[in-house]
Design a protein with these regions (language model features):
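Polybasic (Lys/Arg-rich)
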Residues: 134-178
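Catalytic cores of nucleic-acid endonucleases
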Residues: 62-129, 133, 150-156
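A residue-level signal for beta-strand positions that form part of recognition/binding surfaces
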Residues: 19, 53-54, 123
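Conserved catalytic cores of phosphodiester-cleaving nucleases, focusing on short active-site segments
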Residues: 40-42, 53-61
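Intrinsically disordered, low-complexity acidic/polar segments
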Residues: 49, 66, 135-137
Length: 178
């Protein structure tokens, strides 16, 4: 079993066959420098007869406030959203290209469940988890991140609800954190 400590939260425990810590992987290291990436990819098997889901998870301990009266608040918020966009998109791309064997030795680096993933019907979720964030602060983040990832959602045909922003309380309810 794997647990991941990030941004003041403990994610997991997850089966080591279903969790790929992409941020700390040799695969990510080989793509450096300058490739920002999410923390991990997690296969969440849904109900019987439904396709598997891969949750690509980025964790943060705080976010900028877009409604702040500070002069650079909007710019800071836009930069934050751009960073999360890049991390989630890079993790999606690097994870899928590893699954299809585009990287040398990817099969040896990937957890077992990722090697046989039916990518043509796998559901992908791009997930941001913010520790200690109030529920009422989530909708503006959800909207901004969904807008930033709209091209990705369309080109990858991810479908409605593919971008998810949650706080630690919701993450706990969904079994992401202990």
């Amino acid at each position: 079993m794997i647990t991941i400590e990030e941004s003041g939260m403990t994610f997991g425990p997850f089966a080591d066959t279903h969790c790929f810590q992409i941020e700390n992987s040799p695969l990510h290291n080989s793509a450096q420098p300058g490739v920002q990436i999410a923390e991990f990819l997690l296969i969440r098997n849904g109900q019987e007869n439904l396709p598997p889901q891969v949750w690509i998870v980025e964790a943060k301990s705080s976010t900028p406030n877009p409604a702040s009266p500070l002069p650079d608040a909007a710019e800071t918020f836009s930069g934050f959203i751009a960073e999360i966009h890049d991390k989630l998109l890079n993790a999606l791309t690097l994870g899928v290209t590893a699954c299809i064997g585009r990287h040398a030795n990817a099969g040896q680096m990937l957890p077992q469940a990722f090697t046989g993933l039916p990518l043509d019907r796998t559901v992908f979720r791009l997930v941001l988890v913010i520790n200690g964030h109030k529920a009422e602060w989530l909708p503006p983040l959800q909207d901004a991140l969904a807008q930033a990832l709209s091209v990705t959602s369309r080109t990858w045909d991810l479908g409605a609800g593919s971008v998810v922003v949650m706080n630690d309380t919701l993450a706990r309810q969904r079994g992401l954190i202990a």
